[in-house]
Amino acid sequence: MPALVLIGAQWGDEGKGKATDLLGGAVDYVVRYQGGNNAGHTVVIGEERYALHLIPSGILRADCVPVIGNGVVIDPGVLLTEMDGLAARGIDVSRLLISANAHLIMPHHRALDRVTERYLGKARIGTTGRGIGPTYGDKVARTGIRVQDLLDPGIFRKKLELALREKNQVLAKVYNRRRIEVDEVVEEYAAYAERLGPHIADTGLVLDRALREGKVVLLEGSQGTLLDVDHGSYPFVTSSNPTAGYAATGAGIGPTRINRVVGIIKAYTTRVGAGPFPTELDDKVGEELRRIGGEFGVTTGRARRTGWFDAVIARYAVRVNGLTDLFLTKLDVLSGFDRVPICVGYDIGGERVDEMPMTQTEFHHARPIYTELPGWQEDLSDVRKYADLPAAAKDYIRTLEELSGAPVSAIGVGPGRDQTLVINDLV
């Protein structure tokens, strides 16, 4: 069986956890392929709410194997806390597999992330301060420490000593911060190694064998397309590639294994942190969207910026990811609005632009051009069939499909596992 990719089509927080959980019943493996604990998924099952930061949502399905791929950067302390929290709630975490090639977030990464962000002042990017960027930086610089190094204490110490020789100079002499002691870190990470050792595997090999046996593999990205370090609103992006092109690399499988790419897209738009946001609403309407939609970060608790649906970035996401389907989430949040605007293009210096601007300067100056559709008053939270949606809601969905260039195959009308309308089977 081929693999499928599930990615965010906006600035993250689109509802990927809900989508992954829905598909989890039809897949055998769920693989997280990039990012770290700087993003979170929320899954609601009955009265239970699960906030996941590193572990794939497939952990909540008893017959699914969750995998943390080589493209992820891992804070082992955070991972163990998450595992313990799930275990305390009766979730079997013994199935979790961790790629030996994934990189470790170290104390010096967190320290440097926090201090450099403060140093930037008003020019800061809005990092979560969890060490994600510095870890990816060391990975590319070939000075990182990988999960497999936990299995060899001698190699781990040697790599750590080499890293701290430089990092402590920067912390102490540039930022006037305390040096990090090698022995303290070695002791801390030795405890992590003891607990995580049984979960470490050659996950690329595991997944290849699974695919050859006809198993279904779901590749789950974190964050979203517009936060991609190459294709996002740079420099206000994450330090990895959430887009579909990286899914194979970050999971350790060949790209020809993938035959479907599903983009999760919210019925309106949100983003966290600094950076351009053409449809942002700095008024009571924006506050209302935030309140009704519960737009506060799972990981940071920060209030998300809110705005109307932006068809320009939707088209862009379809293009750069090769999206075959859209999973539209939070349609229920738009109930009660008399009119629902959709951004169909940008005004940049008096010129209309219908595609993503080539430069970030142009994107920064983009002003939305709206078309307005009639809204609907009905509560959608109990709707379970597409045919039962209000006519205005159906018109809204059809318009989004036409403007984005991809079909809507599933619709979320609430946070619950059962609050999803499936139009086309995704697996």
From Swiss-Prot:
Its cofactor is Mg(2+). One of its GO terms (biological process) is IMP metabolic process. Its EC number is 6.3.4.4. Keywords: Cytoplasm, GTP-binding, Ligase, Magnesium, Metal-binding, Nucleotide-binding, Purine biosynthesis. The keyword Ligase applies. GTP binds at residues 12-18, 40-42, 304, 330-332, 412-414. IMP binds at D13, E14, G15, K16, N38, A39, G40, H41, T128, R142, Q223, T238, R302. It is an enzyme of class 6 (ligase). It catalyses: IMP + L-aspartate + GTP = N(6)-(1,2-dicarboxyethyl)-AMP + GDP + phosphate + 2 H(+). SMART domains: Adenylsucc_synt. One of its GO terms (cellular component) is cytoplasm. One of its GO terms (molecular function) is GTP binding. Substrate binds at V298, T299, T300, G301, R302, A303, R304. The active site is at D13, H41. Pathway: Purine metabolism; AMP biosynthesis via de novo pathway; AMP from IMP: step 1/2. Binds 1 Mg(2+) ion per subunit. It is found in: Cytoplasm. Plays an important role in the de novo pathway of purine nucleotide biosynthesis. Catalyzes the first committed step in the biosynthesis of AMP from IMP. Homodimer. Belongs to the adenylosuccinate synthetase family. This is Adenylosuccinate synthetase.
